[in-house]
Amino acid sequence: MKRYLSLALAALVLTGCVPPDSVTPTPPVTIEPVTPPDVEVPPPVDTVPQPPKVQSIDWAVSVEPLVAQMVNSDEVATGSILLVDSVKNNTNGALQTAKATAALHQVLSSNKKFVLISPQQLGVAKQTLGLSEEDSFGSRSKAIGLARYVGAQYVLYSDVSGDVKSPTIEMQLMQTQTGEIIWSGNAPVQY
């Protein structure tokens, strides 16, 4: 048994010995990192959204034909006192109704059929009644009540309705004493 053991030990020792010729050392491999080429990245550009295009409404052209129809009405006496109610916006968007009211005043004042209640008189009357200058009458009955207070014989009630891109202006001329609508008309708004 000693013999087998010494033989096995000799075999292990001999297998561990390798002649120096057969093993060639390999040089260490150096890996160089690859650098990507420098690409200049432009700074991010903040794009400003374009504002919506606001179409300018020519209110004077829009109201002139309606005023001409109203003035030619047989129901209205020349020299009558008229209160022009501010134009209401009943569209699905924003409109410059103050410009519409100013254009309506301008077109009516160039026509001598009515004597207009001035914006200053209207302001004083509103202040006396406890209303602010910016208050619109909101309803026909309030407009008629204010017209009675300032001594007007007629009230012109106007509103713009429909789609804001193609609105329609409607006007109603009412007698102050009875509230009767003696003339009404409507027309598309002109851009």
Swiss-Prot record:
Q: What is its main location?
A: membrane
Signal sequence interval, chain numbering: 1-16
Where is a lipid covalently linked (N-palmitoyl cysteine)? 17
Annotated TM spans: none
One Gene Ontology molecular-function label = enzyme regulator activity
Pfam families per record = LPAM_1, LpoB
Q: Name one GO biological process term.
A: regulation of cell shape
Q: Which GO terms describe its cellular component?
A: periplasmic side of cell outer membrane
Summarize subunit and interaction data from the UniProt record for this chain. Interacts with PBP1b.
Known function: Regulator of peptidoglycan synthesis that is essential for the function of penicillin-binding protein 1B (PBP1b).
Identify its protein family.
Belongs to the LpoB family.
Its protein name is Penicillin-binding protein activator LpoB
Organism for this UniProt entry: Yersinia pestis
